[in-house]
Amino acid sequence: MHIRRPGVWRLRLIVLVLLTYVPAATAQKSASETQPAEQQVASTHESSGAGEGGRRTMTALRLADDESIVLDGRLDEPIWSRAVPAAGFIQIDPFNGRPATEPTEVRIVFDGDALYMGVICYDSEPDRWIGYQMRRDEGLGSDDRFMWTIDTFLDGRTGYFFEMNPSGLMADALLGMNGQNREWDGIWNARVRRSEIGWTLEIKIPFRTLNFNPESDGWGINFQRTVRRKGEDSIWTGWARNQELRRMNNAGLVTGIRDVTQGRGLDIKPYGLVTSEASPGRGSTAMTGSASAGVDLFYNPTPLLRANVTVNTDFAQIDVDQRQVNLTRYSLFFPERRDFFLDGAIFFDFGSDTDGDRQGQGGNQRIIPFFSRRIGLSAGGEPERIDFGTKLTGQVGAQDVGLLHVRTGDNDGADTVGEDFTVARIKRRVLEQSYIGALYTRRGARTSGIGPDHTVGADARFATSTFLGDQNLEAGGWVLSSSRPGVSSDRSAFGATVNFPNDRWIARFDAAEVQEHFDPAIGFVTRSSYRRYAPTLDFAPRPSNHPYIRQLTFGGSVDMLTDLENDLLTRTVDLTLIQVNLHSQDNFSVAATNRREWLDEPFGISQGITLPLGAVYDFTRYRVWGQTANRRILAVSGRLEIGDFFSGTRTERVLNLNLRLRPGLFLYLTGQWNNVRLREGSFTTQLYRIVGETQFSPFMSLVHNIQYDTQSAVVGWQSRFRWIVTPGNDVYLVYTHNWLDDPLRNRFSTFDRRFASKVLYTYRF
């Protein structure tokens, strides 16, 4: 088919410069630092300081045989007074490089089984603490918090992230070269206590929770504290804005940890499950009950490797996916939520999944060769039976390795057969922050008689944090090839990225080609037969001593897709006319987007409305976005987007209300409305979400999630109760109910409902 070439591009770039801030007459003075009169742990020691090469160091103190730590947040054991603290935190914001206005001290001690941390967060106004959240792994964008990272391998690339707040919330993540995995749940424990000097934390991290080299007594470590009411972030080391806590190469050093044990490195985690369900929408109206059991085994064959075996796997306790409205030609992306696949997921990351799309305006062209939601879930997101899975992740010498094999079972009630899935990933660390790697995936049905699908790939990433002195620079490239029966050509994809992610200037360029028959069977791609070019440039100055404005952002991006003959398919120009971040933590932005799109196939945008093949559209849209500070009892955010849309117009409104009635009691309301008027027809979409949370303690919570959207015409309700009896031992009660809009009866009818009760227990050896 002949593809029409567009004429001379008329990039109607909108240029608007809004530099309308007024410098403050006088610089704000930082709050004076005061030392509380009463302390539970006297600050009589000098804080840990710089070691060799200027790296800040501290020493962990070993408990005597007759000493122990009681987790109560009091820090009243004698060893806490003997331990030398890490102190002298420096501000990242708002006054970069100045001492923190509220001091923080961190002490580390250990015994043969666990690492203990004692943290004092001094506060000159101790009654003004902010700690709304208590539920495990909730975000802390609204709260005071204390965060820390541990680089147990001292490689400057990987590590563990932890955070807590004054209400005792515990959150964690795995850090890797391609990002972080927030879904990782390590087994650790902590207690918090608030008093007239501020708030204190007493933390216990079993060595069995961490992978590390027992021959090395030096770990990378860093700490950061947020005082939310002041908008102040301070850090122990690496306070330059280009450095950031999660960049492990900026961490300090803790020494003295030796003669410790990970035990036998064996965790056995059995579960028991009881369910009752009915599916009137599928012809099964009676509630039917069932009971099942399974087990997860975790074993460390070496201190640096972790093996996992799961048998009769079930994920009844996971949260439901958050609904999305799709008005594009591309598939929506829903993240993985199942524990087995999330544990160690960073070892399978591949360089093509950079997710460099700006504001979602470029069509979200993600290329992921291994996407674990392809395993054990139908195209509609319904769970399929997983008989067993095995996984090995960790380090072997200079290599990061990930091996995975999963077998799914036949489903007699659906048109699915059992399959085998295999993934192998290796990355060799080179230089200080770089790697080269390879990937292999295989997917094959056991009974279909059709040969398996394969994907092979290689990637490389080179990074430095010392470009031009103290700037970050990253560059990477990748190549992939898929193989499936009956396809012998045009099966590849390849691309490259250059990234300059810094505080004042942010620049990026992505380029990729996806050939016609490229199809990673265990992957995620939105389309094939295209080339993509996507430059981005942002300028983000910080007005000096301005009384209200913390940072401004101006910038733009171009996201262009062509076919393999370089004929234009889509071109999106997105301009941030201005974004303003205030000291009050309120933010707003104004932006404009121009998009040119040629339809290489008919586009059914809504029921009964199809845009024709070959049509070319050029349209401009404008958006205003704003949000109030999350630290407030009522936080509001919203977006208004107006302008042309394909052959007509579209108005989109989004409103989010977050009501924090008291610590642990929340109500979240979300609404999204689209009003679309096209030559081919008009339609509206609506999406609503109501989430109510009751967090009884950091270890017990009840969450209600109600969602409705007009595209699916389904009301979904999930209630999820979780009780962490002790870390690693959980009780879940989950009720899910879906109603389908029945226009014939003019009411909603039950489509399916399910109740599940699940108990998990961890035995550690």
Model-inferred region functions:
Residues M1-W9:
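N-terminal secretory signal peptides that target proteins for export/translocation
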Residues R12-V22:
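Bacterial N-terminal signal peptides
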Residues A27-R429, G437-A438, I450-G451:
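Structural preference for beta-rich elements and adjacent junctions enriched in aromatics
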Residues M134, G238, R323-T328, A458, ...:
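Short secondary-structure boundary/capping segments
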Residues A240-T261, G409-G469, N587-E641, E652, ...:
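Outer-membrane beta-barrel transmembrane domain signature of Gram-negative proteins
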Residues P270, A291-L297, L305, V311, ...:
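Extended, hydrophobic alpha-helical segments in both membrane/secreted and soluble proteins
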Residues S284-T285, T328, G380, D410-G418, ...:
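Alpha-helix capping and helix-loop boundary segments enriched in small/acidic/polar residues
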Residues R385, T466, D470-L473, G477-F765:
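Exposed, low-structure sequence patches enriched in small/polar residues
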